[in-house]
Amino acid sequence: MENERITWVECPRDAMQGVVRFYPTEAKVRYLKQLMHCGFDVIDIGSFVSPKVIPQMADSAEVIRQLSPHKKGNKFLVICANKRGVDEAIDHPGVDIIGFPFSLSETFQ
């Protein structure tokens, strides 16, 4: 099978959310700008989830707000674990794609 188009996706959110020490918003923005300039089609940039559960993602809305003016064809993907997160993501003009983690395992999430 031949692909006419491959979408290049980077997922820094997955790595960042597991880091215990909170990275400053400015550091995230600097790093993500570099990824944007690499030419990724989609960047999994943050999560609209409870900051009690994943504190590293508490600033996702601000990160996206700061990065949106610099988009050059990139699309921003965010993860939402519930309806509240989806509602917040839908209201954010910088969000292009919403991912919802669905698991068949009772021990995951």
Model regions: which residues?
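Catalytic cores of alpha/beta
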Residues: 81-93
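Catalytic domains of carbohydrate-active enzymes, especially glycoside hydrolases
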Residues: 30-46, 90-98
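Short, well-ordered coil/turn segments that N-cap beta-strands
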Residues: 2-6, 39-41, 69-76, 94-96
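N-terminal small/glycine-rich loop or linker at the start of catalytic domains
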Residues: 1-20, 97-109
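Generic structural signal for well-ordered alpha-helices
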Residues: 29-33, 60-64, 86
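Glycine- and other small-residue-rich loops at beta-strand/loop junctions that grip anionic moieties
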Residues: 20-21, 46, 52, 78
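Active-site beta-loop-alpha junctions enriched in small/polar residues
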Residues: 11-13, 48-50, 79-84, 103-105
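Glycine-rich, proline-tolerant flexible connector loops at the mouths of alpha/beta enzymes
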Residues: 41-67, 100-109
